């Protein structure tokens, strides 16, 4: 029963991350369909309400996936480098995956938020181009799914190993 629960948790997290990735990429497509004028590095364009909504949805779903992972993955506390070096390889892999998950989440979430905010109604302006933030955030959602599964599997194995 535990294996079925673990598989279900992984599928839900991957499903949420894939949904966030698809929404982020669709937001990029919607953003590119808006009229804009470009002169070298500067660009003037109208914000896309569709891109704003899709980006907001992608950010919310990515946060849900990350929170779910941290709730079900548990906490494997390693407080010092000595403790890290003395811990088992499974626990070290788990901690590395957790750190990578947080890094990918921070960069992906930040990219999606930057892309989403550039499509806010109040942001109809000219300036430096900010292309591909939404699609980069979407791609990082796929990477987030990969590290989430790796963390969950290794954290579960480390907990079983400790028993």
From Swiss-Prot:
Keywords: Developmental protein, Endoplasmic reticulum, Membrane, Signal, Transmembrane, Transmembrane helix. InterPro entries: DEAL/Modifying_wall_lignin1/2, DESIGUAL. The chain crosses the membrane at residues 54-74, 95-115, 133-153. GO terms for cellular component: endoplasmic reticulum membrane. It comes from the Eukaryota. Expressed in vascular cells, mostly in hypocotyls, and, to a lower extent, in seedlings, roots, flowers, siliques, developing leaves and inflorescences, but barely in mature leaves and seeds. High levels in leaf primordia. It is a multi-pass membrane protein. Residues 1-27 form the signal peptide. Disruption phenotype: Defects in vein connectivity early in mutant embryo development leading to reduced complexity of cotyledon vein networks and disconnected veins, including in embryos provasculatures. The mutant deal1-1 exhibits a bilateral symmetry breaking but no obvious defects in dorsoventrality; early leaf primordia fail to acquire bilateral symmetry and instead form ectopic lobes and sinuses. Developmental defects of pistils, some being bent or coiled or twisted, and some showing unfused carpels with exposed ovules. GO terms for biological process: cotyledon development; cotyledon vascular tissue pattern formation; determination of bilateral symmetry; intracellular auxin homeostasis; leaf development; leaf vascular tissue pattern formation; phloem or xylem histogenesis. It holds the Pfam family DUF1218. It is found in: Endoplasmic reticulum membrane. Interacts with OPS. Belongs to the DESIGUAL family. Required, together with OPS, for embryo provasculature development and cotyledon vascular complexity and connectivity. Necessary, partially redundantly with DEAL2 and DEAL3, to ensure bilateral symmetry development and early leaf margin patterning, probably via the regulation of auxin and CUC2 distribution. Regulates cell proliferation but not cell expansion. This is Protein VASCULATURE COMPLEXITY AND CONNECTIVITY.
């Amino acid at each position: 029963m535990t294996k079925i629960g673990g598989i279900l948790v992984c599928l839900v997290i991957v499903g949420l991350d894939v949904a966030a990735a698809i929404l982020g990429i669709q937001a990029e497509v919607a953003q590119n369909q808006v009229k804009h004028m470009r002169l070298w590095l500067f660009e003037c364009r109208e914000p896309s309400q569709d891109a704003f909504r899709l980006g907001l949805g992608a950010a919310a779903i990515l946060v849900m996936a990350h929170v779910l992972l941290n709730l079900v993955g548990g906490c494997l506390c390693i407080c010092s480098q000595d403790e890290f070096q003395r811990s088992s390889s499974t626990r070290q892999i788990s901690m590395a995956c957790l750190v990578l998950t947080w890094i990918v989440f921070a960069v992906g979430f930040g990219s999606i938020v930057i892309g989403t905010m550039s499509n806010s109604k109040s942001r109809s302006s000219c300036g430096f181009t900010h292309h591909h933030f939404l699609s980069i955030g979407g791609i990082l959602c796929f990477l987030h799914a990969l590290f989430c599964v790796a963390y969950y599997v290794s954290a579960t194995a480390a907990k079983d190993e400790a028993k």
